[in-house]
Amino acid sequence: MNKKYIMAIDQGTTSTRAMIFNHRGEVVSKSQQEFSQIYPKPGWVEHSPDEIWVSILGVMSGALRSKGISPKEIAAIGITNQRETTVIWDKNTDEPVYNAIVWQCRRTTDICQELKNNGLEDKFKEKTGLVLDPYFSGTKIKWILDNVAGARQKAKNGDLLFGTIDSWLIWKLTGGKVHVTDYTNASRTLLYNIHELDWDEELLDILGIPESILPEVKASSTIYGNTVPYHFFGEEVPISGIAGDQQAATFAQGCYEKGMTKITYGTGGFMLMNTGKEAVTSDNGLLTTIAWGLDDGIYYALEGSIFNAGSAIQWLRDELDLIEDAADSEYFASKVEDTGGVYVVPAFTGLGAPYWDPRARGIIVGLTRGTNKNHLIRATIESLIYQSKDVLMAMVEDSGLDLKDIKVDGGAAANNLLLQFLSDMTGSRVERPINTETTAAGAAYLAGLAIDFWTDQEEVLKIRKVDREFNPDMSGEKREQLYRGWKKAINAALSWSKT
């Protein structure tokens, strides 16, 4: 039977999806399944690795059945995943020793603080490109080994394995034959030296983590192993692509040149700028990460995030009752030509890069008697772009690169007013793709390239279809004037936290 399709598994924070792509890069079938969020204590977040695995089996079956596709028609499988989330399991029994500790979980704050107090922050950043934060996998592994009865001894005996979600899924899909991850996921663990491309012995020693539990690190596009027939409907299918979710989206968006940037607007906003084969160290609190690793080498990226993007629009809907649906925000914002001098700084949970002030709080400034709800809605939309510009300017400053095209995806990318303002404020062309399922597409492309389903990245670029382009339509003088106003508003939010 003709191998006509690539299956992408997109294992996210709240749901698991399987999507089947044809040779034209189109989604021909998909299936989605939510799973439980576990909150044992305030600030703690866990998932059940076994429940995630069951959801994988469910969505793979669902995607095939939905359109009557035979498993024999699947040429390869690609995996993209929520990053940093940590699983440790017994390799002899396949049983997790503890729930997966999710990237959002803050339980290792004290461990990170102790490492900072011991003067180790610069060492970790220099080697891994990351900051000492509970977000990343390293301190989560330490917590499990220190707090689960017998775990540390089992690890010393060589009985335990660690993996981010991609590793756990490949282990299960291959029947326990393959323990592997890719460069993108390894670069999010706080244990991987992104310059030497190896697990860092010194950092492992500091955290008390035996190297024997770690997966082999491979390229993002290569054959890692085959599914065992009893886990893929009687078929052995190569698993040939892996990337963390943000890197997969960046790859799918065709950000293959230095200076190209991807922004995903979800609850927050994730920005990755391709810096080529050079790992750029940030002086602005950005992360240095691996964008992907292919046959022609390792490509690096700067990563920055804003805490409140879609959540700011939800605030208009849920707390202020100014709109009934998030999609209404563009309609009301378009009723006014500008914000009337109003700025909203949605620092509900502090400010991220490049300010890094967890105590900053949200403010609204510039109100007059003529301010109406449309001005407030527009100012909230524009705040997403001002925050994005802050991060993008930090990337430009750190890298010395010119800002090239910006590729946008995520829920808020449907808002034309938002994307036009992004183009105006950055002076860059902004593209929105037809296929906004970019994380899954990235995994599919990486898997397909490894088996020559697609010949090269040029072919991938050709099948990527753009829905709409947005080009700058604002004078430089106006742009600077508006941005100066934003900086004043930011300073007010920062000074509020200090009073």
UniProtKB/Swiss-Prot annotation:
Gene: glpK
InterPro entries documented for this protein: ATPase_NBD, Carb_kinase_FGGY, Carb_kinase_FGGY_CS, FGGY_C, FGGY_N, Glycerol_kin
Pfam family, one: FGGY_N
Catalytic activity: glycerol + ATP = sn-glycerol 3-phosphate + ADP + H(+)
Entry keywords, A to Z: ATP-binding, Glycerol metabolism, Kinase, Nucleotide-binding, Transferase
SUPFAM superfamilies: Actin-like ATPase domain
Described purpose of this protein according to its UniProt entry: Key enzyme in the regulation of glycerol uptake and metabolism. Catalyzes the phosphorylation of glycerol to yield sn-glycerol 3-phosphate.
Any GO BP: glycerol-3-phosphate metabolic process
Pathways involved: Polyol metabolism; glycerol degradation via glycerol kinase pathway; sn-glycerol 3-phosphate from glycerol: step 1/1
UniProt GO MF annotations: ATP binding; glycerol kinase activity
Enzyme type, top EC level: transferase
Name of this protein: Glycerol kinase
Family classification: Belongs to the FGGY kinase family.
Activity regulation summary: Activated by phosphorylation and inhibited by fructose 1,6-bisphosphate (FBP).
Residues binding sn-glycerol 3-phosphate: 13, 83-84, 135, 245
UniProt-annotated binding residues for ATP: 13-15, 267, 310, 314, 411
Cross-referenced Gene3D superfamilies: 3.30.420.40
Superkingdom classification of source: Bacteria
Binding locations of ADP: 13, 17, 267, 310, 411, 415
Chain residues that bind glycerol: 83-84, 135, 245-246
PROSITE patterns (UniProt xref): FGGY_KINASES_1, FGGY_KINASES_2
EC number of this enzyme: 2.7.1.30
Assembly: Homotetramer and homodimer (in equilibrium).
